[in-house]
């Protein structure tokens, strides 16, 4: 397992604010650079500038002595005269195969030139038609005094700067400069536009880099942000030799989880969380941590999934590689950061980028090597629950702040969890039988889980009768809303919760509605909990039900052979739901999945 111990050196410090090079390498022969820029799938994939292909060195030509082509006279009169040839056979040239290879390469290159030229012409024509006007202010020179360059990335660079006038006069800031010449496609233009929109829309969190303004001229776009002079989190990890104590790691992770939970509530997924994208405000040991670089971020609704592959290889989640993901992908990245903080090594490592991707998809992180045996059980459990490959089993950022390892560190205000919306929506659309099953399962919740749900219930401002309604949810959203929440259309999602418009929900039902069966299944106590839940269901919720009625409750169409699918869901002795049917009902196993298994 490779240690997180080095960073690419450069005469100019890598720019923490600048957008990263988005290149996806699929060739196993391409080494994975430790400081490599984020990956982004693209129809046109360029070779990495860090790893050019090497051409063979020219062979040294050996001078050979010429041979006599004539036969000459024989020393014996009885010998047969040698046959005379027009020219002698020369020894095989040691450089001939090299010349052949170079000739074939030249032919291929010449054949490819027309296609390459055509592609370049098409790109130039496309670029000519691109609208690179963003509508930003053009008064940069009158308001901002640019200083020296402090960092450089593939698509731009960052300068220190000062405000010349106004309330912020003499305030030091960082200005990210993105040349418009680098914006060669509509996608790259939209990326810049979206980054500014997200920075402008997100506000009000102490661990979020402050955005001041955006400017443009004919040559560049300028994004003015808070100047963080304390360096990257990665620098501090390296300065410590790659290992943090558990308490020091908690102090870092609490800040990361808090700001990520805030972004997720606003409907923003960062998609490139890594130590390089967290900066300290000052050199002080206990200075505040700020998340930066929203160049790959996007808006996402609670019921929406993204499909483009973006991020950095070591931190990318499995579902991103499968092209179907949402906010849980950020939580995976936090799990990788937590693993590095506690042991100094990456959980997934390989010599090539494609090898890293295979490890992310197939391998399990090791908790057997030092220092893991000496760390607390709670610390290991915390990291494991962030690195579940199934995103449905992964903790959310808000839930992670309630994990026993974190919760015991100091008093933390738990942010509202966007997962609650998804769970309530699914609950309201469930059959009465599934609601009864969820109610039985909620009776087995642990104390820690109940504390988390109590905090979430309080965020929804229950009325004097102890009930939450659609209006109270709207009020809770308005209390926590930023402009980003409007962009991600989260308020529109409330239309799917109309079941609460005329009927409130008390805390007991809220627990049943909010419980995540997949998360609960990942706990060590699952087998015991599900057995106990079934016993409670037998006493209070189970009833005699025929297959046709069960099919109706599940919304199974008449064209589906329900007896084949649901036969094992019902006990033949008394016609009630079997334990297997109870478990499947809780998981919400679709009839399509069940039908596929019977074939």
From Swiss-Prot:
Ca(2+) 2 binds at residue 509. PROSITE patterns: PROTEIN_KINASE_ATP, PROTEIN_KINASE_DOM, PROTEIN_KINASE_ST. Residues 99-130 form a coiled coil. It holds the Pfam family Pkinase. It comes from the Eukaryota. Residues 430-450 are annotated as: Calmodulin binding (CaMBD). The active site is at 272 (proton acceptor). It is a lipid-anchor. Keywords: ATP-binding, Calcium, Coiled coil, Kinase, Lipoprotein, Membrane, Metal-binding, Myristate, Nucleotide-binding, Phosphoprotein, Repeat, Serine/threonine-protein kinase, Transferase. Signal peptide: none annotated. Belongs to the protein kinase superfamily. Ser/Thr protein kinase family. CDPK subfamily. This is CDPK-related kinase 2. It comes from Arabidopsis thaliana (Mouse-ear cress).
């Amino acid at each position: 397992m490779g240690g997180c111990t080095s960073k690419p050196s450069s005469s100019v410090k890598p720019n923490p604010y600048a957008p990263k090079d988005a290149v996806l390498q699929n060739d196993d022969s391409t080494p994975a650079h430790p400081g490599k820029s984020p990956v982004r799938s693209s129809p046109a994939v360029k070779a990495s500038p860090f790893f050019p292909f090497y051409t063979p060195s020219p062979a040294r030509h050996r001078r050979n002595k010429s041979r006599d082509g004539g036969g000459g006279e024989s020393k014996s009169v009885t010998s047969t005269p040698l046959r005379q040839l027009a020219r002698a056979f020369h020894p095989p040239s040691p450089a001939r195969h090299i010349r052949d290879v170079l000739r074939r390469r030249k032919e291929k290159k010449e054949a490819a030139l027309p296609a390459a030229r055509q592609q370049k012409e098409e790109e130039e024509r496309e670029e000519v038609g691109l609208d690179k006007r963003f509508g930003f202010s053009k008064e940069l020179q009158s308001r901002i005094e640019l200083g020296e360059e402090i960092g450089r990335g593939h698509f731009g660079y960052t300068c220190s700067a000062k405000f010349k006038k106004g309330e912020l006069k003499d305030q030091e800031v960082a200005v990210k400069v993105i040349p418009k010449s680098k914006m060669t496609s509509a996608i790259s233009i939209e990326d810049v536009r979206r980054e500014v929109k997200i920075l402008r829309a997100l506000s009000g969190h102490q661990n979020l880099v402050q955005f001041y303004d955006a400017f443009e001229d004919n040559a560049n776009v300028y994004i003015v942000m808070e100047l963080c002079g304390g360096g990257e989190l990665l620098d501090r990890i390296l300065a410590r030799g790659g290992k943090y104590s558990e308490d020091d790691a908690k102090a870092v992770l609490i800040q990361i989880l808090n700001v990520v939970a805030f972004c997720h509530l606003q409907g923003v997924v960062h998609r490139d969380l890594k130590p390089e994208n967290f900066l300290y405000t000052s050199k002080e040991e206990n200075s505040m941590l700020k998340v930066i670089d929203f160049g790959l971020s996007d808006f996402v609704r609670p019921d929406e999934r993204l499909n483009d592959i973006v991020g950095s290889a070591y931190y990318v989640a499995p579902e991103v590689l499968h092209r179907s993901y949402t906010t849980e992908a950020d939580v995976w990245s936090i799990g990788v950061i937590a693993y590095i903080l506690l042991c100094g090594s990456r959980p997934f490592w390989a010599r090539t980028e494609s090898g890293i991707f295979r490890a992310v998809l197939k391998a399990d992180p090791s908790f057997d090597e030092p220092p893991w045996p000496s760390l607390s059980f709670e610390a290991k459990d915390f990291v494991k629950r962030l690195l579940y490959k199934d995103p449905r089993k992964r903790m959310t950022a808000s839930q992670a702040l309630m994990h026993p390892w974190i919760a015991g560190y100091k008093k933390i205000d738990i942010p509202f969890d966007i997962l609650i919306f998804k769970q309530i929506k699914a609950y309201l659309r469930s059959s009465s039988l599934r609601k009864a099953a969820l109610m039985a399962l909620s009776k087995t919740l642990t104390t820690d889980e109940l504390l988390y749900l109590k905090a979430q219930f309080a965020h929804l401002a229950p009325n004097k009768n102890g009930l939450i309604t659609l209006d109270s949810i709207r009020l809770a959203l308005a209390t926590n809303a930023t402009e980003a929440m409007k962009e991600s259309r989260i308020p529109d999602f409330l239309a799917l919760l109309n079941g609460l418009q005329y009927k409130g929900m008390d805390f007991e039902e809220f627990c049943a509605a909010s419980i995540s069966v997949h998360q609960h299944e990942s706990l060590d106590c699952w087998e015991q909990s599900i057995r106990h839940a079934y016993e409670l269901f037998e006493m209070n919720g189970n009833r005699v039900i025929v297959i046709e009625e069960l099919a109706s409750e599940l919304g199974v169409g008449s064209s589906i052979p329900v007896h084949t699918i649901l036969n094992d869901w019902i006990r033949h002795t008394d016609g009630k739901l079997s334990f297997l049917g109870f478990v499947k009902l809780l998981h919400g196993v679709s009839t399509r999945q069940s039908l596929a298994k019977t074939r």
